[in-house]
Each structure stands twice: as C-alpha cells, then as structure tokens.
Amino acid sequence: MNLKQKWDVYSRLTRLDRPIGTLLLLWPCLMALVLAAGGMPDIKVLIIFIIGVVIMRACGCIINDYADRDLDSHVERTRSRPLASGEISTKEALLLFVILGLAAFGLVLLLNGLVVKLSVVGIILTIIYPFTKRVTNMPQMFLGVVWSWSIPMAYAAQTGEVPIEAWWLFAANWFWTVAYDTMYAMVDRDDDLKVGIKSTAILFGQYDRQIIGLFQFAALLCFIAAGWSADRGLLYGLGLLTFVGFSTYQQMLIFGRERAPCFKAFLNNNWAGLALFVGLGADYLF
C-alpha cells in the first residue's frame, strides 16, 4: 500500500472525508466558548478546542469502528469501512487511536487543572460509548453525554468553573444529539435489527418521529434557558427561530422513514447548529 492509499484508508477510518460529525461537535463547543467568554474567547483556548474537536472526533470514529468491526460488514452503510473490509489491522487502528489520544491530551495539558480532570472523564466516555450498543437500547442517550462533554470543558478552560448556564447548554445539546442521532439510526434500522445492534430508532418504534420531535422541543427550551442565563437578545432569538425551521424541515424528511431522506435530515442538523452559533455570535457583535 503506497502513501496515497494509506492516507485514503486513514482518512476514511477517522472520517476526515466526512466532516459532518466534526461540525456537529464543533458548533456547541464554539457556543460554549463564546458564552463563557461573554463574546470573543481567548485565542489560545479557541485554537486548542478547535484542534481538539477534530482529533477527538477522529478518536471516536476509530474506537467505534474497532468495537463494530465484526458487525459493520453486515450493514449496508458501513461494510466498506477500513476495519470491516480488512484494509487496516486492528493493531494499527488502535495504535493510531493512542497516538491521536495522546496528542489531544497534550493540548489539554496547556490548559488548567479542571479541564485536565474533565478531559480524563471525556476520553473514558468516548471509549465506552461504542460498546453501549450491545447492552442498551439507548446508546444515543449515552452519545449525547459524550458529544456534550466539550461544553463543561470549554467553560472550565475559559472561566475556571462550570456554572449553571453551562449545564443548560449541555442539556440542550444532549436533547439535540439524541434527536439527530436517532434520525441517523433510522437509516440503519433494518440492518441493525438483523445483526442485533440496539438503538433508540428501534426502541421508539412507530413513535420515533413524535419522540424525536419532543427531544427537538426540549433542546429548544434548554437553548432558550442558556441564552436567558447569559442575557442574550434578539439576534440569538433569530438563531433559535432558524433552528426551529430546520427542525421542522427534518420532521418532514423523516416522515416516510426512508433511508435517504432520514440521512438527509441528519445532515441538515449541521445547518441548524451553524444557525445557532451565528445567531449567538451576531448577538454579541451587534
């Protein structure tokens, strides 16, 4: 395997070729940094968190594919993943995970002690998550915690503490993550049932759309509470309205429960997150 082929394999293993997950992690992290700073965050902290999000997203993908390597070959969407297809060995994948994990931890060491402690919890959660799909019908709810963990870390890095405002944002992102990852799970539901992978899409059954809607509404309420705690105004409110618009569109897409529209609904959440971040940033600027 030449260097170009090796890069292609690593890129697919870490999902660098599919940045949607990185973006969905990035928007709430950036929102947390802006809220914690009351505007423009410290540049050093901002750069560390942006790089950290990219690295930890890659780590999460590697450990997820390692855990699912014997199942992914039976699922239409995942059978071409490098570990499932045998393009890379488990030893090489785990080595890459360790290298990236150490790089991320090295970045964290540039910050304060509270962030370091929170980061240890974060890496443990990241490792545990992929295996929850075998023991619970609610892995998306565990993922919501994993994908929201950068929020208390961001507040800790910027202010040295984690105030109540941070936990409102944490709750908002948790509800939102469960909603959009259930849309994602709807894409694989038929295959997951065959191979025994558990998900909220299977758990919710015929009420999946309604429960996703409830989680979207709960996320909205918590985003409102986070903004209210930080005394945000009209432009943040416009961002929230745009979020509602995207959420409504996603409900339309998943109505028929077909694979392609459900995946499109999942991808659309990137724009919902961008709208929230732009609304928040504009509210501080203007």
From Swiss-Prot:
Keyword set includes rRNA processing: no
Gene Ontology BP term (one): ubiquinone biosynthetic process
Broad class of the protein's primary localization: membrane
Record GO cellular component, one term: plasma membrane
EC numbers: 2.5.1.39
One Gene Ontology MF term: 4-hydroxybenzoate polyprenyltransferase activity
PANTHER family documented for this protein: 4-HYDROXYBENZOATE POLYPRENYLTRANSFERASE, MITOCHONDRIAL, PRENYLTRANSFERASES
HAMAP family registered for this protein in UniProt: UbiA
Protein's name according to its UniProt entry: 4-hydroxybenzoate octaprenyltransferase
Annotated source species: Shewanella sp. (strain MR-4)
Taxonomy of the source species: Bacteria, Pseudomonadati, Pseudomonadota, Gammaproteobacteria, Alteromonadales
